[in-house]
Amino acid sequence: MRKVMKPMKDVGIVGYGAYVPMYRIRNEEIGRVWGVSSFPIEEKAVPGLDEDAITIGIEAARNALKRAKIDPQKIRAIWFGTESKPYAVKPSATIIAEAIGATPDLEAADFEFACKAGTEALQAAIGFVGSGMAEYAMAIGADTAQGRPGDHLEFTAGAGGAAFIVGEKSNESVAYFEGSYSYVTDTPDFWRRQHEHYPRHGNRFTGEPAYFHHIINAAKTLMEELGLKPSDFDYAVFHQPNVKFPLTVAKILGIPKEKVLPGLLTGRIGNTYSGATMVGVSAVLDIAKPGDRILWVSFGSGAGSNAFSIVVQDAIEEKRDLAPKVEDYVKRRKVIDYALYAKARRKYIL
């Protein structure tokens, strides 16, 4: 049985865009409040009072449209992956579609699968375009991640997102998909029940049986099915709940950390959950050369991984400067203290 997934038509990325909120809180500041002196990252992005997963998705989608240079009316599906949607009952994707001028002739839906909701939406978009049902489809991954005050998640739960517009592979594609693979099991490593404010996690259980098991199996299977070796890739982007985990995966797979660091942003903006690997791949596309091959592996608790192999095309040279780059957003920062952070994240629950 063939495990790798390939659509009937070759599919490429015609436009991509990212967005990261301006505000930052240093891990040192969080540690000062909770009496902690060792930190997993340097700082994380914090959404403003008027920002949420939808507004982040809109900004990313607009940047993707700038690079795609297409009429938004040609987009026949907008699928939005998040685990922090503002409405419990009401789709977020419809708001994004309206904001970018893509309504009314399209599919729209919200996807959920913890931190791989965005790449789950991307898998669907590839299939939708690859089957011939649509000329273009957009997949978005964005989150304003939450962590219980004082919990170790609070040090890393960031905010940000990215959008990818896919279409049939052509000279207008900045990159194309060689194939993809998904690996899923029922692993309860991280969850949040209805009406609870903050997620719960299985501490160390989130590592070996969850994150590492799924990402490594997804990456190895994809490479085996495509006949590729770790040395065939110029860059690798793995889900990044912290800085340590993706570098450990790279070491296990035999990929030098120099190929991982360009897309490893968690240390500076935090774990953007559904946006994590999508923002990371956007950062890599901002600097990649035509012909470069990128290994892209997401992870979502519950648990599963999506793995993609993409190859950069000539159009990247023209299109990457048509919208703000990831590094532009990372450098655009204003540091705030814990009091303002707690207000912005609505941690004062009355």
UniProtKB/Swiss-Prot annotation:
Q: In which pathway does it act?
A: Metabolic intermediate biosynthesis; (R)-mevalonate biosynthesis; (R)-mevalonate from acetyl-CoA: step 2/3
Q: Which UniProt keywords apply?
A: Acyltransferase, Isoprene biosynthesis, Transferase
**GO process annotations (BP):** farnesyl diphosphate biosynthetic process, mevalonate pathway; isopentenyl diphosphate biosynthetic process, mevalonate pathway
Q: Could you say which residues bind (3S)-3-hydroxy-3-methylglutaryl-CoA here?
A: C115, T156, T206, H239, N271, S301
Which reactions is this enzyme annotated as catalysing? acetoacetyl-CoA + acetyl-CoA + H2O = (3S)-3-hydroxy-3-methylglutaryl-CoA + CoA + H(+)
UniProt-listed Enzyme Commission number(s) = 2.3.3.10
Pfam short name (any one): ACP_syn_III_C
Q: Which residues bind CoA?
A: R204, K244
Q: What's an example of a GO molecular-function annotation for this chain?
A: acetyl-CoA C-acetyltransferase activity
Please name the SUPFAM superfamilies in this protein's record. Answer: Thiolase-like
> Which InterPro entries did the record assign?
ACP_syn_III_C, HMG_CoA_Synthase, Thiolase-like
EC main class here is transferase
Q: Which residues form the active site?
A: E83, C115, H239
Say which family it is in. Answer: Belongs to the thiolase-like superfamily. Archaeal HMG-CoA synthase family.
Entries under PANTHER family matching the protein: 3-HYDROXY-3-METHYLGLUTARYL COENZYME A SYNTHASE, HYDROXYMETHYLGLUTARYL-COA SYNTHASE
Function (record text): Catalyzes the condensation of acetyl-CoA with acetoacetyl-CoA to form 3-hydroxy-3-methylglutaryl-CoA (HMG-CoA). Functions in the mevalonate (MVA) pathway leading to isopentenyl diphosphate (IPP), a key precursor for the biosynthesis of isoprenoid compounds that are building blocks of archaeal membrane lipids.
Q: How does it assemble?
A: Interacts with acetoacetyl-CoA thiolase that catalyzes the precedent step in the pathway and with a DUF35 protein. The acetoacetyl-CoA thiolase/HMG-CoA synthase complex channels the intermediate via a fused CoA-binding site, which allows for efficient coupling of the endergonic thiolase reaction with the exergonic HMGCS reaction.
Recorded protein name is Hydroxymethylglutaryl-CoA synthase
This protein's species is: Pyrococcus furiosus (strain ATCC 43587 / DSM 3638 / JCM 8422 / Vc1)
